[in-house]
Regions:
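Structured catalytic/nucleic-acid-binding cores of DNA maintenance enzymes
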Residues: 1-279
Length: 279
């Protein structure tokens, strides 16, 4: 699933293509799942003729601010993403591969928007787990209004962060994946943050010491900032990151530092961690 860094990269692509441009044509698939039963005709009416003022993001959700409401909101699900002609789609760093290629329109396309300068932007989703919605005020309406702080732009100050953590009793891995706590954190980022913070993913949030909470906040800020700056190129992640060696549940996996990696299911998700560091 695209996590915050990938969605931020998608937002930047969309911002570059769409900001300041007027929408001159819209093609919309008849897909009641992805579009949550909003008819294609309504999407065309809502978008055609509108000018894009900005593209915003909160967690894994993004939306387009138009010169008239409602505004389109996107969540990529497991395999969704934006495409532009001749550039394919964004690489999902968790899978280390490109999207479905450079054909246009892309396979599994759900929405194509054409702009007054000739540019185009498409939303495609192979598994149909993504969602496209129309909202009058996206940040004030579900699902975005139900999210916690944005893990990159909205990290709370230390005292507030401590209160949020100590108020919870769930295992730390489950807490980081809870979008009502920190919006945008997914599986590999949660594992990386806990590894760098030296915290056992099974620890209950309310039992963390002040020093552990300080390390947690610092690791969250660092991992998100570095991964966003890398612009979806995981080769630019530090070689000492757990990320590079965590995949595949390999029983013989070790970090670049020679630390043995263990895989467990915690909070319903496969978790890679290093007991010698996080125990």
């Amino acid at each position: 699933m695209p996590e915050l860094p990938e969605v931020e990269a998608a937002r930047r692509v969309a911002q570059r293509v769409a900001r300041g441009r007027r929408i001159v044509d819209v093609w919309c698939a008849d897909d009641p799942i992805v579009f949550e039963r909003i008819p294609a005709a309504r999407w065309r009416r809502a978008l055609r003729g509108r000018r894009v003022r900005a593209v915003k993001r909160h967690g894994k959700h993004l939306w387009f601010e138009l010169d008239r409401r409602p505004w389109p909101c996107m969540h990529f699900g497991m395999t969704g993403g934006f495409h532009t002609p001749g550039r394919g789609t964004l690489r999902l760093v968790a899978h280390g591969k490109k999207g479905p290629g450079l054909t246009w329109p892309p396979r599994f396309v759900k929405l194509i928007v054409k702009f007054d300068d000739g540019g185009e932007l498409a939303f495609a989703d192979a598994r149909r787990l993504g969602r496209a919605r129309l909202r009058v005020d996206p940040a004030a309406e579900p699902p975005i209004s139900l999210l916690g702080f944005d893990a990159w732009r909205g990290l709370p100050p230390p005292a507030s962060f401590k209160r949020l953590v100590t108020a919870r009793s769930s295992p730390m891995k489950a807490l980081l994946l809870d979008q009502s706590f920190a919006a945008g954190v997914g599986n590999w980022i949660a594992d990386e943050v806990l590894y760098q913070a030296r915290i056992d993913p099974r620890r209950r949030a309310g039992t963390l010491t002040d020093e552990e909470i300080r390390r947690l906040r610092a690791a969250l800020a660092r991992v998100i900032a570095v991964s966003v700056r890398a612009r979806n190129d995981s080769d630019r992640y530090p070689r000492t990151w757990l990320f590079h060696d965590r995949w595949g549940r390999n029983p013989k996996a070790y970090t670049a530092r020679g630390e043995k990696i263990r895989h467990d299911t915690i909070g319903g998700r496969t978790t890679a961690w290093v007991p010698s560091v996080q125990g």
